Structures are given as structure tokens and as C-alpha cells.
Amino acid sequence: MKKLLILGANPETVSLILKAKELGYYTIVTDYDPHAYAKSFADQAENVDAIDSDALIELALREHVDGVLVGVAEALLPTYCEVCKRLDLPCYSTVDKFGIMARKDYFKQKCREYDVPTIKEYRYDELEEGCYPVIVKPVDSCSSKGIRICYNKEDVENAIPYALRYSKSRKYLIEEYMVGDEVVSYYVMQEGTPIFVGMCDRYTYKEKGDLVQLPNSYIFPSVHIDSYINYTDAAVKKMIRGLGLENGSLFFQCIVDKEGIARIYESGYRLNGAQEHLLISRVSGIDVKKLYIDMAVNGKVSDLDLESMANPKPLKLTCKLSPLVHTGKIKSIAGLDEINRLPCVVSVNPSYREGDIVAGEGTLKQIFCRFYIVASQKKILKDTIDQIHNLLSVKDVNGQEMLFGLFDTSIIDDRY
């Protein structure tokens, strides 16, 4: 049995581990945290720090691994590249390309070079009364960490040190704070060919004034998909080719402006923590997890013609529902088994167990679970989400309900 070494063991890595096991591989997962969530799903769990390349090499040689994978943690990509290179194992890209796509400032510069619509930036000394509100963020962080919305210069002065706390390079970005629909577009690359595979509407809930909005639902296909295909897709594909991104997957977070044009502000050149691949595989047969696994072992993502399989405008509605919870310690969780038995629910991916502590207010750490739904009609989708909301309960040590900001299903009637 061939062995795969998977770097990082956060909850979002579980689906990758399960897919590798389904395909017949022996899975070794490593993370410095001995209690990391995904470890219990692997065949073998190690406590080697996934940024310690020397220790990872030693582990890989000792276990005679046949391929190396990284889960969803962007910070592990440079180590992943080094480990693959030193072991002479396939790697889906290079450190310099990961660096461009992971650094928000570098990435946005490439967007401008290739005429990809993006969001206006400001230097600190350019800020004037008419610029506000703006958003301050680290150039090299993810999962909504280090981000603040600012309504005046004093807010900006307070937000900059906060952003720098989450920036390895000690750099920040100031952008126009756009109000509009949020969308996410998805691509896979096969031997240099970029393939548009899906696009969703990203719905969010905003709890406090200076905190960013957190996603509580993604719905495919996006109501803006035709506009995206007409105004943005060609430029994005040109950029992907120009940057030499040969294999793997990409996601782009965008805001739709008043003219209906999707403006890209962030990218991810990896498996997405939102795990939209669980839905895209259901409507197209393209399973991004399998592409990464095949690349790790065989050096190519697929022998299939992925472009002919792509189905970015499926007839079915699909949804990633991600209920939010307040910070605190979880005492009890109810409803997951019943939800898992609902006919349209194709996957249930919790982030926490009873006894876990939810920290990181205003970040994606407040997502309690991700539910994946495939429905043939919008009424069925709406009813399924309402059922999930009614069944699910997460209570803290004081017996208080921790769930908040649930997705408003009336939106489905209004927009789809």
C-alpha cells in the first residue's frame, strides 16, 4: 500500500484524508499539536511540526512515503515545496508562484498587469475624508485574521499595528471598503490549461462595527456568473497562463461593483478551507482532492479531460452552510446525526467537539461546522437549511446557545 504524508491536521483537512483512504492510500498526518482535530481520521498521526522541513524529511524517509500533500494551510506551502524537492517527489507548483498568490500586494499587482478587475488601494499618506470607509489587512495572512474596517484616520492608526501582528513580512494593505455582493470563483489547472469550474454567492453576517463579515452560506451557481464569464473570466485565465500556474486549484474572492463586475481582492492557490470541492465534485465529477492526490503520487493531476467535464452552471442548487458560534467553551452539541441523515445533505464537517474552546473572535475560527447540500429545486434547498437550523444546537458551559447569525433563507426565494 502506498503511503501519503499530509502536512497539517486542522478540521478542514479531514475530507482530504478520507479521500486518500478511499482511494486505497495509507495516510500519515503530522501536526505539532498532539490533539489536532484531523489526526484521529488518519491511519497514522505524528507530532512533527509541519514547518520543520528537516524533521519532515526524516519522517518521510523513515516511513518510505510515496507522496506529500498539504491540507488547506497556506503557511505550510513553502515547507511543502522544500520537502518535495529534497525527496524528489512531485510538487504541484513552486515557492515563487505560491509567494505571488499568497501575498495580497503581489497578487493585486499581477491583477493590474493582466487587466483583472480588482479593488482600489491607498497608501497611508493618500487617505482623505472621502476615502472612508477603508479596510486594513495584513498582506500575508488568511482566515480573516488581522483585518479591521476603518471609518476615519484614527481607526486606521489603531488597525495598522493589529494587522502587523498577523503579518510575517510586517506589511499591511489599505483598500477601499466596497459594499456589494460577494462571490468566489473556482478554477483547476491541468498541464497549463486553466478551467473555470464554479462560482458561488458568499453570504455573510456582521456582528460588530470594526470586525469583518463572516460567511454563513455559499450558494452555487452564483447569480452573477454570466457577468463574470463576460467581463472577468478571460482576463483571469490569461493571468493564470502568464504566471505559469500549471496544476492544482485556485479560488478568487471578489466583490461585485455597481456595474455588476466582479472585482477580485484575494486568491488561494491550494485546497480551500471552505471545501467547495465537495459540491463541485457532485455536479461535475471533478474531485479536486483526487487531483492533488494523483499529482502527489503520479506527477499529473488527471488522465481525464477535465475541461470537458467542467459544469460551472449546474441545474442543481448547491450550498455550503456554515453556522457561526460565539467564542467560549462548548459543553454540548446536538443535532449532527439527524442532519447527516437528511436526504440532500452530502457531507457534515464539524470544526469542534464537545469540550473544545472557540477562540479568535471575528475570524473563521467562529465557523462551528460546514454542511454541504445538493438540491434539485430552490424550495428543497430552503427547507433543508431551515431543518438544519432547527435541529442544530451548540451550548456553552453556562447552558447558553452559542449559535448566532444564521443564514436568512428568504434570500433563496428572492434571488434564485
PLM regions and their residue ranges:
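Short acidic-hydrophobic, aromatic-tinged amphipathic segments that line or gate anion-handling sites
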Residues: 45-51, 121-124, 150
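A conserved helix-loop-beta module that forms one wall/lid of the active-site cleft
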Residues: 85-146, 153
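Conserved ATP-binding module of the ATP-grasp superfamily
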Residues: 117-119, 133, 147-181, 199-200, ...
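A short glycine-rich, hydrophobically flanked beta-strand micro-motif that places a catalytic Asp/Glu
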Residues: 175, 246-258, 304-307, 403-408
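ATP-dependent carboxylate/phosphate-activation module, predominantly the ATP-grasp catalytic core
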Residues: 177-179, 187-245, 249, 256, ...
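A structural supersecondary motif
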Residues: 250, 263, 339-356
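A glycine-rich beta-turn/hairpin centered on an aromatic-Pro dipeptide
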Residues: 301-343
